[in-house]
Curated annotation (Swiss-Prot):
Source organism phylogeny: Eukaryota, Fungi, Dikarya, Ascomycota, Taphrinomycotina
The keyword Nucleus is assigned to this record: yes
SMART domains: WD40
Organism: Schizosaccharomyces pombe (strain 972 / ATCC 24843)
InterPro entries in the record: G-protein_beta_WD-40_rep, Pfs2-like, WD40/YVTN_repeat-like_dom_sf, WD40_repeat_dom_sf, WD40_rpt
Name of this protein: Polyadenylation factor subunit 2
WD repeats: 72-109, 113-151, 156-192, 196-234, 238-278, 282-321, 350-388
Length: 509
C-alpha cells in the first residue's frame, strides 16, 4: 500500500531515561531532622528496591565511592553533528550548555536530556566558556580570539577582541569583577569585566598557553602551557610566583580544588598522567596514573574534596579517590590489569573506578552536576554523554559496552538471547510425577515411589497387602471409595468403651 506524499510518518514510541533527584532530595529534607546526631550516616541497603531511599550525594559525604558516576544514562547529539569542545552545567543545574566546533551553543534538559535550544553564538569554534559566580553572566572564547558576554538566555550583549590567536581558556575572579584569558599567542590577560578593558598582560610561558584557572577564594592564578610548565601568578601585580616542572609534555588543563579550602591544584598532561599539587608545599603530592594515552581534561567533584575525574584522548574516564592508600590502589589496579607493570610508590595512585570505553574518540571537556549525582562528558566523537552513580545492588551498570567493549558486550548479548530462545523453545517431557501417583494406587506396586534419582534405592515393606491399606481405623476401607467406612469393631476411645442399644454410653446414664 503506497503512502500519500503529505502523510505524516508515525514514529515508534521510545522510552527516555531520566534521573530525577527531586524525590531523594525531598526525602532527605524531611528525614534529616530525625537523625540521632549530626554524625549520623545513612547507608542504603544493597537491594534494587531501596532506590527510593537513595539520598543526594551530600548525605554520603563520608563515603565518596557511593557517588562515582559510572552508570551510562543517555547520549545527546545534534542533528548536524559536530565536535563538542565545552560542556557546562547552568548554576541551577536544570540545563546543560555545550559548545561545538562550529560556534553553536546547545541547551539540553538536565532531567530528560532532550534538546531545548540551539544558538549560533560564534563565527569560530567555541574553545572555552565559564559562568560567573553569581550565575548572571556567561563568557566564552573562540578560535578567532574573541570573548563574548552572554546572558542566561544566551543573548549576546558584548564582544571583545581579546587575543590575536585562539582563546583557549577563561576564568572568573571570586567576586566576578575581573576575568582572565589564556591564548595560543603565549600570553595571559587580566580584564575588567564591567569595563571590558585589559588591565594586565602576563608573559612568561615560552609557548601556547592551554589553560588557566583562578583560585576560588584567593588572588592566585594557575596556568599551563605547551612548554610543559605550570606557573602561578599574582593577578594584582602580574608577577610569576612559582613554577612547577612535574610534567613531561603539554599541560592540557589545570583546575583548583573547589571549596573546602582549595589547597590543591590538579593538572593533566599529554604525558598520560594527572598530578595533584599542594599549594602550601608547592610540590606534587599525588601522581595519578591509569590512562594509556594523553589526558585532556579533569574536574573536581563539587561535594567531595578528595574525588576527581579525568578524561583521556582514547575516550576513557577514570575516577580517583585521593583518600585511598596508594599501595592499596596499586594492588587493586594490578588485579584488574595483570599485564601492566607497576612501580610501587607512596604517591602513585591508580583509578578507583574506570569507564574504558566511555567515548569512541577523545574527551575534550567534562563537568559534574552542582548536586554531584551526574557527570557530563563532551567528546571528539560529536556526542555528549551523561553518567550517574550506580543504584543499590545494580550489577548491570558495569556490564555494558562502555565498560566491556563492543565485541565483548555483543558476545554477552548473543549468549543472553540464545539462553532466552532456549527457554522459550523448551518442551518438557511427560511429567514423571503423574505416572508415579498412578502407580501408587496399584496393588501390585511394591517398593518406594518411582521418583527421579531414587530408582536404585532399596525397597521397603509396602503399606498395601491384598489391596487393603494397613491403617488403624480403616481396616475395611478400599481404594475405590473416596471415604473409608467406619469399622464394625469396638474402637477404644476413653469414656466410650461400651455402648448400649439406644446409642448412649452406659457410663453416662
Amino acid at each position: 500500500m503506497e503512502r500519500a506524499e503529505n502523510a505524516r510518518i508515525i514514529q515508534k514510541p521510545m522510552t527516555r531515561r531520566t534521573v530525577d533527584y527531586g524525590s531523594g532530595l525531598s526525602k532527605y529534607i524531611v528525614n534529616r531532622h530525625l537523625r540521632s546526631n549530626r554524625y549520623h550516616i545513612h547507608v542504603p541497603r544493597p537491594n534494587p528496591n531501596q532506590i527510593i531511599n537513595l539520598y543526594p550525594p551530600y548525605e554520603y559525604k563520608y563515603n565518596n565511592t557511593s557517588s562515582l558516576c559510572t552508570k551510562y544514562i543517555h547520549t545527546s547529539a545534534n542533528k548536524a553533528r559536530h565536535v563538542i569542545n565545552v560542556v557546562r552545567w547552568t548554576p541551577d543545574g536544570r540545563r546543560l550548555l555545550t559548545g561545538s566546533s562550529t560556534g553553536e551553543f546547545t541547551l539540553w534538559n538536565g532531567l530528560t536530556f532532550n534538546f531545548e535550544l540551539i544558538n549560533q553564538s560564534h563565527d569560530y569554534a567555541v574553545r572555552c566558556a565559564e559562568w560567573s559566580t553569581d550565575g548572571r553572566w556567561l563568557i566564552s572564547g573562540d578560535g578567532g580570539g574573541m570573548v563574548k558576554y552572554f546572558e542566561p538566555n544566551l543573548n549576546n550583549v558584548k564582544i571583545v577582541q581579546a587575543h590575536e590567536m585562539e582563546v583557549r581558556d577563561v576564568a572568573f575572579s571570586p567576586n566576578d569583577s575581573k576575568f582572565v584569558t589564556a591564548s595560543d599567542d603565549g600570553s595571559l590577560k587580566v580584564w575588567n569585566f564591567h569595563m571590558s578593558t585589559e588591565e594586565l598582560k602576563l608573559t612568561g610561558h615560552g609557548w601556547d598557553v592551554k589553560t588557566v584557572d583562578w583560585h576560588p577564594s584567593k588572588g592566585l592564578l594557575a596556568s599551563g602551557s605547551k612548554d610543559n610548565l605550570v606557573k602561578f601568578w599574582d593577578p594584582r601585580t602580574g608577577t610569576c610566583i612559582a613554577t612547577l616542572h612535574g610534567h613531561k609534555n603539554t599541560i592540557m588543563q589545570a583546575s583548583f580544588q573547589k571549596n573546602f579550602g582549595s589547597n590543591y591544584l590538579a593538572t593533566v598532561s599529554r604525558d598520560s598522567t594527572c598530578r595533584v599539587f599542594d599549594l602550601r608545599a608547592m610540590k606534587d603530592v599525588r601522581v595519578l596514573r591509569g590512562h594509556e594515552k594523553d589526558v585532556n581534561c579533569v574536574t573536581w567533584h563539587p561535594l567531595y574534596p578528595n574525588l576527581l575525574t579525568t578524561g583521556g584522548s582514547d575516550g576513557s574516564v577514570n575516577h580517583y579517590s585521593l583518600d585511598e592508600p596508594p599501595l592499596l590502589s596499586q594492588q587493586k589496579y594490578h588485579e584488574k590489569h595483570p599485564n601492566v607493570t607497576l612501580s610501587a610508590s607512596s604517591y602513585l595512585l591508580y583509578p578507583t573506578a574506570e569507564i574504558p570505553f566511555a567515548h569512541d574518540l577523545g574527551i575534550w571537556s567534562m563537568q559534574y552536576h552542582p548536586l554531584g549525582h551526574l557527570l557530563c562528558t563532551g567528546s571528539n566523537d560529536k556526542t555528549t554523554r551523561f553518567w550517574s552513580r550506580s543504584r543499590p545492588d545494580d550489577k548491570e551498570s558495569t556490564m555494558d559496552r562502555h565498560h566491556l567493549g563492543e565485541e565483548q558486550s555483543e558476545a554477552m548479548l548473543s549468549q543472553r538471547k540464545a539462553a532466552i530462545e532456549e527457554d522459550d523453545n523448551y518442551e518438557p517431557d511427560e511429567n514423571p510425577l503423574t505416572e508415579t501417583l498412578a502407580n501408587a494406587h496399584n496393588p501390585q506396586f511394591s517398593g518406594v515411589l518411582n521418583l527421579p534419582g531414587l530408582g536404585t534405592m532399596p525397597s521397603f515393606p509396602s503399606p498395601y497387602q491384598h489391596g487393603q491399606p494397613q491403617i488403624p481405623g480403616m481396616l475395611h476401607a478400599s481404594l475405590s471409595n473416596s471415604y473409608a467406612e467406619p469399622s464394625t469393631q469396638n474402637s477404644f476411645i476413653p469414656g466410650l468403651t461400651s455402648k448400649s442399644q439406644d446409642g448412649y454410653p452406659q457410663n453416662y446414664r
